[in-house]
Amino acid sequence: MSVDLDITGGVARVTINRPERMNAVDLATAARLEAIWQQIEGDPSVRCVVLSGAGEKAFSAGADMKSGDKAKSGVQYWADGNPMGFGGITFRDTLKVPVIARVNGFALGGGMEMVLGADIVIAADHARFGLTEARVGRLPLDGGMVLLQRLIPRNIAAGMMLTGRMVPAAEMARYGLINAVVPAPELDAEVDRWIADITACAPLSLRAIKAMMRRTAQMSAREAAGARLPELIEALNSEDQHEGVAAFNEKRAPVWKGR
């Protein structure tokens, strides 16, 4: 399989497994990713997703330009559109659980666009990030051009895209894109710490928070505060919101049911 999926203990680990191609995404890999996202969306046991690339060199180098797939022209690719973004994740608003990008190396082009679709980014200190499309005569069409400038200072985003430069993880952390940068041997332990904290929270609360953040980002604060999203109402009416208060008062760990 070009992408591996393991679901254990409520955590779905999605690993692009093409290390010989720097985990670049060809048509078959893109189709496999889409099938995986749909499977996860239909599995209520999943509480968190970890997206990574196999090996130690690359998270993903983006589109596989040597795959042998019938190539589209740039304008054909743009005209066809990709509503979910690169790898089916950049713009995906139907995946309601937190997504961690475990960045174990280069995240370039579409690989970086997948990072932009994550909720939390954990990177090894040797990781490098870049929207390098202009260096091969293409554009960051699957989310890079519109999202990067919303997530880091505009002039920094412009500098990256207008030069195609690759930026070290520590620098991207200073710009606010990365939650944690750790030495490579500590990457999995750091990811596990984030998973533990996420799964300690009520699942419906996290779904509501993610939905509110995603869907109200372009609203005024007053408009956003007044949004009545279904996920918000579900969380506020859930058994878990009673369980959380009871557990706090009884000085015990809550037992979440996700309902």
Where are each of the predicted segments found?
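A generic local structural motif
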Residues: 1-2, 34-38, 84-90, 116, ...
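An acidic, glycine-rich surface segment that forms the CoA-thioester-binding/catalytic face
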Residues: 30-32, 38-41, 65-104, 136, ...
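Conserved CoA-thioester-binding segment of acyl-CoA-metabolizing enzymes
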Residues: 1-56
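Crotonase-fold acyl-CoA enzyme core
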Residues: 91-204, 233, 237-238, 242-246, ...
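Short, active-site-adjacent cap segments at secondary-structure transitions
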Residues: 56-60, 108, 130, 213
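C-terminal alpha-helix plus adjacent terminal tail
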Residues: 1-12, 43, 56, 67, ...
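Terminal peptide-recognition signature
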Residues: 14, 18, 33, 51, ...
